[in-house]
């Protein structure tokens, strides 16, 4: 059973150039489309950007110009994983302004990048939480097990008593 949406009817009449993010859920009856957005997905983009060796800007310009077929993208063959650190209480009520420390040590884990989402520097220059999903700890590894170990090793170095993360990221694929 297929359904159409008002947005899909608009897309049938227009040429779309840009990013299209599809949120999917795998069910016992196969994949189901939950949502689609004209933007990059979060945290899906973090793992893609970690693996992308090519400069992203020329690809985005080519996409807008309609010449994306002329761009060659070079990808790192490593596995990648992103563990989101969120404020306690998220997605319901959560506190802003809580202190986050240890990112310098965490960022030194091999193959790891820390992406900021809901952070800011307060007047004293200290990093604080300013949203629900706050950090995306993203790691590469020769396989998913190694990437997962690196990401959680980095998470464990972050001192943020008012934050949490899921500890099951990647387990189905491993």
Task: Outline where the language-model segments fall.
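Residue-level preference for beta-strand/loop junctions
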Residues: 3, 16-18, 77, 131
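Conserved metal-phosphate-binding beta-hairpin within the catalytic cores
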Residues: 12-42
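Peripheral (often C-terminal) accessory segments that flank ATP-dependent C-N-forming ligase machineries
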Residues: 62-174
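Conserved catalytic motifs of the protein kinase core domain
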Residues: 6, 29, 33, 80
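Short helix-capping and hinge/turn segments at secondary-structure transitions, especially at repeat
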Residues: 29, 42-45, 54-57, 61-69, ...
